[in-house]
């Protein structure tokens, strides 16, 4: 009975905070958590199996673990705080970095951040501010550079999945194997044609806006054009 009550509460929060164009809001939470479990298993494969298939493995071993429901509850509360821009949980500069990432050209950042949270949360389910800030800066720089240099929906999988394994092993995220030449990136950005139809255009607008210290936090559902 207690399990059913907690499960229903999880469903309610997911429906409240996640937009799920395909699948259900709960699928979104389970997907974010899956990347943490994948990383712990050391899976680097760029092909991701279907959500149901992943959790069905070994007779639903992950779902049967005692800590799994608690982990899902912690993860959904974290994302609730992110999406409500909770300034009791996050500093202003963290909220600004998260606001920029909200306009990232793809959703890979949510998986990286979910893995980071699961690995580094303290007993109060909080993250050390300075380390989290540095992590957000790194993934923002890398994701933006990748969008210019290797555009494509699935291109980020190759560098992101190994980095998730680095995170769960307590190592610093540095994308060492996948770095670009700074001059080459600068050249591409300077000659790029920014049109409204390109996802990176909104990403750059958000990045530019929040680099201005006087820019107030905008609600995350604001459309940038």
Task: Name each region found by the language model.
Residues 2-223:
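A cross-family structural signal marking well-folded subdomains
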